[in-house]
């Protein structure tokens, strides 16, 4: 028994790499790319899995579809339309896969601003050489409190980084 997986949308080089890796890892997996509407309607008739965005018209021939992989962590408004919600299709997304990367990036900014690097970088760029190191707006992080607004995956990972730097952390989820 084979499993047919369809990528909806245009080929971009990355998708082909994923498809190759998927086919090598999963014996019997058939991967298709459907960028044109007519081809999407045909390929979805036998598909068990799909990556992309469906609409009402594309859902009609997708009788065998069991899994829809959303192309974003937070799909746009209208992605989950009533017919899709009422179907037996399992929908997954990227939620959580960037928590560590984004929280590390946030901490890079916290460290930069806490040491006044944004001022020094601007001065250096403008060839402004001053002896203002002793007047640096440095903030000692263990004496600071971080307010995390939104304690989902990224907020929780950021809170953990802040704790590692000795900060008091307050998290709220609006």
What are these regions (language model features)?
Residues 21, 105, 109, 157, ...:
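Rossmann-fold NAD(P)-dependent oxidoreductase module
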Residues 11, 73, 96-99, 151:
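Short beta->alpha junction loops/turns
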Residues 86-145:
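Phosphate-binding beta-alpha-beta segment of Rossmann-like dinucleotide-binding domains, i.e.
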Residues 135-174:
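Rossmann-like dinucleotide/phosphate-binding beta-alpha-beta segment
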Residues 1-92:
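An N-terminal-biased, well-structured beta-alpha scaffold segment characteristic
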């Amino acid at each position: 028994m084979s499993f047919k997986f369809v990528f909806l949308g245009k080929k971009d080089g990355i998708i082909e790499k994923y498809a190759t890796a998927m086919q090598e890892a999963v014996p019997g997996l058939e991967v298709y790319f459907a960028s044109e509407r007519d081809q999407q309607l045909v390929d979805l008739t036998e598909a068990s899995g799909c990556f992309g965005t469906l609409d009402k018209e594309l859902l009609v021939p997708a009788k065998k579809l069991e899994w829809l992989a959303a192309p974003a962590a937070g799909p746009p408004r209208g992605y989950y339309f009533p017919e899709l919600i009422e179907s037996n299709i399992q929908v997954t997304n990227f939620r959580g896969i960037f928590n560590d990367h984004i929280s590390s990036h946030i901490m890079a900014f916290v460290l930069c601003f806490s040491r006044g690097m944004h001022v020094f970088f601007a001065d250096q760029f403008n060839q402004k050489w001053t002896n203002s190191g002793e007047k640096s707006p440095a903030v000692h992080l263990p004496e600071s409190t971080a307010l995390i607004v939104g304690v989902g995956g990224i907020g929780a990972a950021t809170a953990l980084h802040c704790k590692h730097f000795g900060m008091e952390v307050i998290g709220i989820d609006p």
